[in-house]
Each structure stands twice: as structure tokens, then as C-alpha cells.
Amino acid sequence: MADEDIEHAIDNVMSIDDQDDDTRLYIGSARNADLLEVVTIVRDDGSELVIHAMKMRPKYRRLLPGD
């Protein structure tokens, strides 16, 4: 997956789900409009590091607005 698609998904986020383990799940669109799931770890200084990115799985559809 291209870094540009991951950045696009985070910049054009449709849903953010903060997890209990200092990770954050973003649901957003790639440049071609495919929905992606992107997981970041939130560092102590507030910056984030992407640790997972792939096409959104159906189990996350519930996080989308209107679903």
C-alpha cells in the first residue's frame, strides 16, 4: 500500500476509534476512494506511527457514519 494512500485515508478520515492500548483506528478513503483501515500507535509526545493499513474489512462498517 502506498504511503500516499495511507496519508490520504488519515487526512480524509470518516471515523476514528481510540483503543484502550494507545492505538487509534482510522477509517478513511485511499486516493482511489477504496475504504482503508489504518491503525496508529500514539507515542508519549502525541505523534503517531502507522503500524497497520489495509482495505477496510466488513467488521468495521459499523463505524461508518449512517451505518
Give residue spans per PLM region.
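Ribonuclease/tRNase effector modules and their secretory precursors
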Residues: 1-67
